[in-house]
């Protein structure tokens, strides 16, 4: 990150990230990609609660150290990914996941903002209690309603990544416009609902960025002055 910041010379911010303790635990319990073994992983968590708790506590300590190292190395912000939030039952989320979020965000350096991403954001009320500076939300969350619920919170999202992958440029423009309208252009970071899909055309990503820059300009402030500097 230090080398990247030197190369960028303050022109762009650098975002650090880490998988959440539960996301890492899913991979460790499955022994490989857990997507085909979700039921088995969830059954293990419930049946082996003490082992799961011990594993999550160890991973939480490691995650805090890892993210703080990234901040010390020059990350302007860090994001924690809860990649399987959409399949985790509420009781498991409350018992095992939420405590890791609260411990991590309370232990991070305050010199950089922190972002919490939970896939499709099924538990917004709990996300708001995590201690993160920013919440990255999925398609199931209406930005307008989220901001009414928590007017001081900064939300990130939530253009559908499928539109970028398979949509026309006109559809991408419309999606960005809708996202800005829902957010009211206040306390909002434009982004996707999730990562880029593998088959997303570069031209569509470029168009998304160009439209975001054009529609997201702050009145009276040149776009190049909006980025944080070192």
Predicted regions and their residues:
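Active-site loop segments of alpha/beta catalytic cores
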Residues: 2-230
